[in-house]
Amino acid sequence: MRVAIAVLLVAVAAAGERLHVDHYFTYEEMTQALKDLAKAHPDLARVESVGKSLEGRDLWAFTIANPKTGPEAEKAAMYIDGNIHGNEIQGSEICLYTIDMLLNEHGKDPYLTRLVDERVFYIIPCVNPDGRVAFMREPNSPHSSRGNRRPVDDDNDGLVDEDGPDDLDGDGAIRMMRVRDPEGDYKTSPTDPRMIVPREKFEKGEWRLYGSEGLDNDGDGEINEDPPGGIDLNRTFPSNWGPKSEQAGTGPYPLSEPETRAVAEWMVAHPNIASAQSYHNNGDLILRPPMIYDDDRVPREDLETYDAIAKRGKQLLPDYDYRQVFRGLYPVRGGEIDWTYTGLGVFSFTNEIWDLKQDVNGDGKQDEADWLAWNDTVLHGAWWKDWTPFDHPTLGKVEIGGWSKWALRIPPAWMLADVCHRNATFTLFHADAMARVEIGEAKVTVEGTTRRVRVALHNAGFLPTVSGQAEQAKIGAPDIATIEGTGLRVIAAGRVDADGIRVTPVLYRPARVEVPTVKGLSTVWLEWVVAGTGDAVVTFRSQRGGAARKVVRLQ
């Protein structure tokens, strides 16, 4: 019924008509929405498949760029993705909302118009389409299905995916299952009989909790020990990757899965990507790398940049906490934003979308009781099913109850507008902060038959043209400044020191000067000595800061 209603709500039409992100899109709806948006804005947008998922679904990448304001490759690009974990679906809706807002407000909203004109946006709304489809179509808990759909032998019995949770009561959800047992580890909560809590060591038990409802499908005496797939896609990226002995969910080798290999290869093929944002759930968190070590290995200037962007993020997302993953959450090997930062050298964030963070029942704590109270009052009990007796074929009398798959991690659809807008606005602020190179003042001094040309290379963005990590690890192409002209001979070149007087000479190829980086909102001066007259063209190309050109009259 939920999917049927959602289909009726899809509305994408001609240019200028907004996409209604007021429900959770099926994969088919998302595909159609992306195609319709690209068709409605052919001058600014295109959609392409960058690969196939394990089950053969297209991985859609959406590009927003204005060719009238310059070549795509000569603009800094913001990469955005969502739904790398199958059950973390709202990231896709934020991506759709962002696409729609940028396209349909272009020419209307001055800020968004400038972003589209100056920047490029590469957006992959759903990295894990198979996981999304499985979550939406099949019975699940709030925490499944997380990985892709690769069959895995979790219990090492030579079979794959043969003993997963079962929707025993047929209500479309995988809930919890308990058995009354005086030796069990749990008791009924004294504050709410729906909850069970750990008993004290000296107390008599009341319940044995079996976790998700299910059967012993393979007859090995265990329940739900080998559920369907798969590989945790956010454990398969190359940077700091680790095998199963070091963390659960990883694949046999880095980029072993078609989904993440396609995404990684596509990103590498777009070296103008200067920043990255990935949407997950949940917890109301703004996360940054590193994911496997502390900040003592991170260039200080990069930490300052991260902190400044996150400070603005806290204004836009006031309930969110800002944390470094390794220190503030838990270690992650092979994480996406660890690779985009340490491997590609681009500033990267993950937002963990949504949490309750309310003391709804006024007891001074924030726990499951608050979720129950909020569900009772705001959702009229829709997310919770009371414990119900069930005759289990091997366990006997059990009770099944608890949360639906739509609970705890995913905001109700009517909250999507606020969730999408705030997170999209944070990411667009990050995109606006990316480097943007300009050529400022050019001074020409005549010295006999030669000319001394001093030029200001300016970065109008807040981010540096090359991150400290990229500079330290020698990632990507260097920034290059050139001077050329008809009959022009370049004799010497140098970088002007901070005092504006001394010049550090460039020893090789003076017509082509490498610039290590231009910090945010800063200027670097270069100087050439040339022989020739007429016009010279100075060009400054930054792989992640764009390109600028200036014609200089040599007199």
Residues covered by each model-derived region:
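Short amphipathic, basic-aromatic surface patches that mediate peripheral association
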Residues: 457-471
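Short glycine- and acidic-rich boundary segments immediately preceding or forming the N-terminal edge
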Residues: 16-58
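Acidic carboxylate motifs that coordinate Ca2+ or other divalent cations, activating on Asp/Glu
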Residues: 153-157, 171, 218-220, 363
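Extended low-complexity, serine/threonine- and proline-enriched intrinsically disordered segments
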Residues: 470-489
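Low-complexity, intrinsically disordered segments enriched in Ser/Thr together with acidic residues
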Residues: 514-537, 542-550
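Short helix-loop-beta-strand segments that form the rim/entrance of peptidase-like active sites
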Residues: 91-137
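Sec-dependent N-terminal signal peptides
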Residues: 3-12
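Metallocarboxypeptidase
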Residues: 46, 59, 122-126, 130, ...
